[in-house]
């Protein structure tokens, strides 16, 4: 049984990302004092996988289709029950009661992200989640930033700044989920404190690799990058992929499955009808590593440490390729997972949404305008009370 310290407040963070694999959850304890209120301690973690049927339905909702409103509403209810199951596991594992938790910060599942049109949609049913758990729920974190002229993404760099910045060296945090994004954490400024210089989505993370291995082997992902490691990068295909205009756009910018999907990949592959599937997988890994390395070389040439979180941190082949890609760009830099800094790579995003829930609870801004492009700091989220 966990003893709840009266000097801390408990929040749950729930995250399901563009990989569409399941829900990662953490039970986090935050100190109540102002100086250390960002220093989260993970008391428990849980993972609830999506069924193949739910993944298919979420995938179809990424693009326009028939009867979308009803299908999305039903999926939202299913996601809420999955989230509730994750919360139940966290409470059991932490030895805590629902009434000891201040709030749940839940991201939901992105099915549309159109900041250029002024909206984003993360499907879930936070009202149902509050009813099922008896805990206040804070959701819809991205819309407020978009309303203020921002991209609504990435939001996690604000958390990266709070927990990973170092006063004497520039660090880059790389989150490799379905999409990859970077947070550049500058060394201490003359005025004191660390400045997050910039953060943005670099392009595909695991999304294209996962898609290709699913199409060819029926697997959800390439374990340890073993299939890619057995292939050879196709230079002309890599160049064709790198010609995507998104990569040349200046930040702030964000992307997702709206751009990097099966049709995008098929269009690139149509230029090269003769190819080995393993070679394509190796090329897609090189695409992820190259676009991350290009972004770091351009925006953080003084980087001293690159730390990686998300599912990509568990792919040794991809980690190796990233290190090589950085070296080819003249960056002799240490590449580690966030485990080296005390947080498991698969916990970072869920912890970030527990932190964002805490920020909402304290009525503090959760976005970084330098990252998202919003006109100013904004309090993110909407409250769904349990009572």
Give the ranges of each region predicted by the language model.
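Glycine-rich phosphate-binding/hydrolytic loop that grips phosphoryl groups
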Residues: 20, 149, 282, 286, ...
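Phosphate/ATP-binding catalytic cores across multiple sugar-kinase/actin-like superfamilies
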Residues: 82-90, 277-302
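Short beta-strand-loop/turn "lid" adjacent to the catalytic site in phosphate-handling enzymes
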Residues: 65-124
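Glycine-rich phosphate-binding loops at beta-strand->alpha-helix junctions
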Residues: 111, 303-325
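Conserved ATP-utilizing enzyme core subdomain
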Residues: 8-10, 22-50, 194-289, 293, ...
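Short helix-loop-beta connector
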Residues: 5-8, 97-100, 167-169, 300-304
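Phosphate-binding/catalytic loop of phosphoryl-transfer enzymes
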Residues: 4-10, 115-120, 127, 135-219, ...
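Conserved non-catalytic scaffold segment of RNase H-like nuclease domains
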Residues: 38-78
């Amino acid at each position: 049984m966990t003893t709840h310290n009266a000097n801390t407040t408990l929040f749950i963070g729930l995250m399901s990302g563009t990989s569409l694999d399941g829900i990662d959850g953490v039970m986090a304890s935050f100190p109540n004092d102002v100086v250390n209120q960002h220093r989260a301690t993970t008391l428990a973690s849980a993972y609830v996988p999506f069924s193949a049927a739910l993944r298919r339905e979420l995938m179809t909702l990424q693009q326009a289709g028939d009867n979308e409103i009803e299908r999305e509403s039903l999926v939202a209810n299913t996601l809420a029950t999955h989230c509730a199951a994750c919360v139940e596991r966290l409470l059991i594992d932490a030895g805590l009661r629902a009434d000891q938790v201040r709030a749940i910060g839940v991201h939901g599942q992105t099915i549309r992200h159109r900041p250029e049109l002024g909206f984003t949609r993360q499907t879930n049913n936070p009202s149902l989640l509050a009813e099922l758990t008896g805990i206040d729920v804070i959701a819809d974190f991205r819309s407020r930033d978009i309303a203020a002229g921002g991209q609504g993404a990435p939001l996690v760099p604000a958390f990266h700044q709070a927990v990973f910045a170092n006063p004497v060296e520039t660090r880059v945090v790389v989150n490799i989920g379905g999409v990859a994004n970077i947070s550049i954490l500058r060394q201490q400024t003359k005025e004191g404190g660390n400045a997050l210089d910039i953060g943005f989505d670099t392009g595909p993370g695991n999304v294209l690799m996962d898609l290709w291995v699913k199409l060819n082997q029926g697997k959800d992902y390439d374990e340890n990058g073993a299939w890619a490691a057995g292939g050879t990068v196709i230079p002309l295909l890599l160049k064709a992929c790198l010609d995507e205009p998104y990569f040349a756009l200046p930040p702030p910018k964000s992307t997702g499955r709206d751009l990097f999907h099966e049709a995008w990949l098929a269009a690139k592959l149509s230029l090269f009808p003769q190819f080995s599937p393993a070679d394509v997988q190796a090329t897609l890994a090189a695409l992820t590593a190259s676009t991350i390395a290009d972004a770091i070389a351009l925006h953080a040439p003084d980087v001293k440490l690159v730390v990686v979180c998300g599912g990509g941190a568990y792919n040794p082949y991809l980690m190796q390729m990233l290190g090589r890609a950085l070296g080819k760009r003249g960056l002799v830099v240490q590449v580690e997972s966030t485990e080296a800094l005390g947080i498991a790579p698969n916990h970072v995003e869920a912890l970030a949404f527990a932190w964002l829930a805490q920020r909402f609870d304290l009525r503090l801004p959760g976005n970084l305008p330098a990252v998202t492009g919003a006109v100013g700091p904004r309090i993110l989220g909407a409250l769904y009370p349990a009572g």
